[in-house]
Design a protein with these regions (language model features):
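Hydrophobic anchor at the beta1->P-loop junction of P-loop NTPases
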Residues: 5
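The conserved Walker
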Residues: 9
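Walker A/P-loop
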Residues: 14
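Residue-level signal for inorganic ion chemistry
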Residues: 31, 82, 106, 148, ...
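ATP-dependent small-molecule kinase phosphotransfer cores
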Residues: 32-103
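ATP-dependent NMP and nucleoside kinases share a basic, alpha-helical "lid"
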Residues: 92-99, 104-140
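Small-molecule kinase domains that catalyze NTP-dependent phosphoryl transfer to phosphate-bearing small molecules
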Residues: 93-94, 119-120, 136, 143-190, ...
Length: 197
């Protein structure tokens, strides 16, 4: 069973994923899976290197994600090509992890709806915070306001994702309130799974 956690960049998906892990959930982050695909001897490594050349390599021989981002966020065609390579690889890795055992997999999938993957999820949790909080989180990561705005504008609005989700978690709140929301959602999902058995 796949429980997808989605939301825009800087919404707090990783923090929420950690909360679920602390509650005993099996967890995975699609971004981590994608980053793993960029390592040498992984399927995406050779394909991307053949397509863009050595200019996308970091000094340590891995693919430089910042250089790749610079390419794909300047060209819709290059972004579409990258997605056509990466999405099937990431999706298969997530499905493999979900099928390892009977426990539900709580997986952070930032672009769940944009990628058309919502049908693969048994339940969807959407994470929301106000745009200024989201912007401040991205600036704290070292992003310029303009770069953050461009990235946010390239994704679905958080409100649109909320409307399509089974559960919602508001992340622009106190740590305790966030932990309480995660516990309540986790218990509701576990109860629904138990009832369906």
């Amino acid at each position: 069973m796949l429980i997808a956690i989605t939301g825009g960049i800087g919404m707090g998906k990783s923090t929420i994923l950690s909360q679920f892990q602390g509650l005993g959930a099996k967890t995975l982050d699609a971004d981590d899976v994608a980053h793993d695909m960029y390592l040498p001897n992984r399927p995406a490594y050779t394909t991307l290197l053949q397509h863009w050349g050595n200019g996308i390599l970091a000094q340590d021989g891995t693919l430089d994600r910042k250089k790749i981002a610079g390419i794909v966020f300047q060209s819709k065609e290059e972004l579409a090509w990258l997605n056509s390579v990466m999405h099937p690889l990431v999706r298969n890795a997530i499905q493999d992890c979900a099928n390892e055992d009977a426990r539900p997999l709580f997986c952070a999938i930032p672009l769940l709806f944009e990628s058309g993957w919502e049908e693969t999820a048994d339940k969807i949790i959407s994470v929301w915070c106000d745009r200024e909080t989201q912007m401040q989180r991205l600036i704290a990561r070292g992003w310029s306001r303009e770069h953050a705005k461009d990235r946010l504008d390239s994704q679905w609005s958080p409100e649109r994702k909320l409307l399509l989700a089974d559960y919602a978690i508001v992340s622009g709140c106190s740590w305790q309130h966030l932990a309480d929301q995660c516990r309540i959602v986790y218990q509701a999902i576990v109860a629904s799974i138990t009832q369906s058995l």
